[in-house]
Amino acid sequence: MDGTPLLIVDAANVVGSRPDGWWRDRPGATARLRDTLLTVPSDGVPPELPPPVEVVLVVEGAARDVPSVPGVRVLAADHSGDDAMVELVEAHPQRRRLVVTADRELRERVTAQGAEVYGPRWLRDRDTRRRESH
């Protein structure tokens, strides 16, 4: 494997995994998710993913206009978000690729391309660990 690991986050799936009213403001919920990822490039997601890390948040639908910020590239899918994530995995075969989703079909598609898959709880647990350590 070459280069910086690539963390690909399924925004719709991760946002939708927590019943916190996201459906009232999908762009806002997606921006909040993006902001929780700001420290991943420099901190990683211990212990599984040490830094540095490239982070790509894949968005679609009502969240398409959420902008990128330094450290988190937001990719608005031209077609389906799942297809965009598979294309990202396929485009970087020499890198370690981690996809965050609970979507079973997407999990199968990206693992067939050699990616690792983690569920939304993995990211939420990271945030909980970070808050408890500060």
Model-derived regions: residue spans:
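Nuclease catalytic cores that cleave nucleic-acid phosphodiester bonds
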Residues: 3-6, 14-134
